[in-house]
Regions:
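Glycine-rich phosphate-binding active-site loops on the catalytic face of alpha/beta enzymes
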Residues: 135-143, 205, 217, 275-295
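C-terminal extensions of enzymes
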Residues: 1-7, 324-386
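C-terminal hydrophobic structural anchor segments
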Residues: 289-342
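Short, surface-exposed connector motifs at secondary-structure boundaries
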Residues: 27-32, 247-256
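Active-site mouth loops of central-metabolism enzymes
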Residues: 30-41, 72, 100-117, 184-189, ...
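Alpha/beta enzyme core
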Residues: 18-24, 41, 45-59, 63-66, ...
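Metallocofactor- and cofactor-centric catalytic cores in central/energy metabolism, strongly enriched
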Residues: 2-15, 29-94, 99-102
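C-terminal helical cap(s) of enzyme catalytic domains, especially alpha/beta-barrels
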Residues: 142-154, 223, 227-229, 291-308, ...
């Protein structure tokens, strides 16, 4: 006999509000998997099936660069991505997912950019997104000498855009994510920077659930001369814990979101990552590389078309072809969009199966246990409808 929470998330429903997920998981003891499924619906289906079979909630997300009103580099708009995830949920019979707008990035902070971001946010709200990340970390002022001045533009733009969302969604319990340290830079976010950022947003009535910091990881992967992924071991766990503990000591419930997990050995995550302090783990490039690996075996003609297109358009100087491909193949997704829709049923099954198995491994390494059951319990106890 099925448990109540299973029946609940098997029933067609809207994406789970991110704020409900954040509240329901207290006390925090795990990391929630957040997936950027850039290529093919089968990746989403495989992951959702793994969620259904193990009772998990997952976050499905794409960044502004990946998905936009113009299609980003995946060819997906906010509405088409939302529909893709919904269609996968219908096929699998599992609606335990948050729909997250990742990296709504501010690079200049001028009027034109902010107006465009408002249009992009409107599109995501209309498409039913239930969580939003404002990333103005590029505006860090390296010429300034005080934390207040260094973060001034970051904070002002974060507040402006978070308030824009709040005005649109009112009391809807959406997820809120901020970013104080640009992912991939050499400097580590200071404890004082994280505290100042969260304090200032709080003063403006914005409680951030997740905070992204610069702690030594980067987006994507690095490869050696043979094309093997070089393990990413640069995360500064000590600084991450210091920031999380400092936030908690001041009474903030904000937890860390870890970007740039692809390339980090899963055993390191399982054994060393401070679960609960890091509450959200973003995995994007990993799933794209998974699809390339399957295509190389099951659809070699398509794989080599993609490979040659990437090398021809993006290789610089004597850069290794494998390095060029790993770095720039994401730009092939939009170019070959229609061809991904024509892959064989055998290939689709392979992608789903591989995504399913890998998702199970991430769940285990992240310490995820019965997250759907916990969320269901919270929803029932608080008589929440969404």
């Amino acid at each position: 006999m099925k448990q109540d929470y299973v029946r609940f998330f098997e029933q067609p429903r809207n994406p789970l509000p991110g704020g409900i997920l954040f509240e329901a998981l207290r006390p925090y003891r795990n990391i929630i998997l957040a997936v950027n499924p850039r290529v093919t619906i089968e990746v989403i289906e495989g992951i959702l099936k793994a969620c259904k079979d193990t009772g998990q909630i997952v976050i499905m997300e794409l960044a502004l660069s990946e998905m936009s009103l113009k299609g980003g580099y995946t060819g997906l708009t906010p509405s088409s991505f939302a529909e893709r995830v919904k269609h996968a949920a219908e096929k699998v019979g599992w609606y335990g997912y948050v729909l997250h707008a990742d990296h709504m990035t501010v690079k200049k902070g001028d009027e034109d950019e902010l107006k465009n971001l408002e249009r992009e946010l409107d599109a995501r709200i209309e498409a039913g997104f239930t969580s939003f990340a404002i990333d103005s970390s590029f505006l860090f002022n390296r010429e300034a000498h005080s934390v207040e001045d260094q973060l001034k533009d970051i904070i002002e733009n974060s507040i402006y855009l978070h308030k824009y969302i709040m005005d649109k969604l009112n009391d809807f319990p959406y997820g809120r994510e901020g970013e104080v340290g640009e992912i991939g830079i050499k400097e580590f976010t200071e404890v004082a920077e994280a505290l100042h950022y969260v304090r200032e947003l709080k003063k403006s009535g914005i409680d951030i659930h997740f905070l992204a910091i610069a702690n030594g990881t980067k987006h994507g992967v690095s490869v050696d001369s043979e094309g093997n992924i070089v393990p990413q071991l640069g995360i500064n766990i000590k600084r991450t814990v210091e920031i999380a503990d400092a936030l908690q000591a001041e009474g903030f419930r904000t937890r860390i979101v870890q970007h740039g997990i692809t390339g980090t050995p899963l055993h390191l995550i399982a054994e060393k990552f401070p679960k609960g302090r890091i509450l959200k783990g973003n995995v994007g490039t990993f799933w794209m590389l998974l699809v390339w690996d399957i295509l190389r075996i099951f659809e070699p003609e398509l794989y080599w078309k993609i490979n040659h297109w990437v090398i021809e358009n993006y290789r610089k100087g004597d850069e290794l072809e494998v390095e060029t491909f790993n770095k720039y193949s994401k730009y092939a997704i939009k170019h070959f969009f229609n061809e991904f829709e024509k892959i064989s049923e055998e290939t689709k099954l392979a992608i789903k199966s591989k995504a399913y198995a890998e998702a199970l491994t991430f769940f285990k390494a992240f310490g995820m246990e019965e997250t759907a059951k916990k969320v269901y319990k919270y929803i029932q106890e608080n008589k929440i409808k969404y």
